[in-house]
């Protein structure tokens, strides 16, 4: 008879952490599924002040990518730097991450999808630019925080937790990197024509490569950089 493997206290904690992150994001997705169309209509309504629209959009974004890992950090008394937000290897992580995104960037140009380089641009950005320079700067920092920092850092933290829970002695494979990459791909529109398959391949290379770089450098700034200046910019 096969004996049941007994989990260590650390493994149990990591399982709880993953459940917290998953359930938090799921709860926000459920809310979005119920009232998402109304929220989108509200956020796109230029007759309403840009600030409440930005706040609503940022709240939903943070709920999906950021709230769960923040709860885990508070619960475990962990700091963000403990997950790789540090100076050491930061340039190496950023440089290597950029290389991982090169095939994806080439795909954007070759497929004719390039419409301009617009980092930190979301649906309320045009109205934000009409509010004056100071307000634009503040709003842009908010966008950078929720659509750049937290989205990129969210990948790093989840990857870190999965890798600690399911460690693999491999240089180029990581359960955390694989799961996070598939998660990122599944939550974006897909098609299965030639261009769709090329997009799938280049997206996989970009995200998986980014997280393998994180695994080797133990520096999360590459992930953050990618989501501020590449992923949400083209």
Locate each region found by the language model.
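Aromatic-anchored segments of alpha-helical transmembrane domains
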Residues: 26-35, 101-109, 180-190, 228-234
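Short, Lys/Arg-rich, polar N-terminal cytosolic tail immediately upstream
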Residues: 1-13
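Structural signal for the C-terminal ends of transmembrane alpha-helices
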Residues: 34-35, 71-80, 166, 213-217
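Alpha-helical transmembrane segments in multi-pass membrane proteins
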Residues: 14-76, 96
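Cytoplasmic membrane-interface regions of multi-pass membrane proteins
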Residues: 2-5, 74-85, 160
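Juxtamembrane helix-loop-helix connectors linking adjacent transmembrane helices
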Residues: 42-55, 80-150, 164, 169
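Residue-level signature of transmembrane alpha-helical entry/exit and packing/kink sites
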Residues: 14-22, 53-61, 92-97, 136, ...
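Transmembrane helix-loop-helix hairpins at the membrane interface
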Residues: 136-234
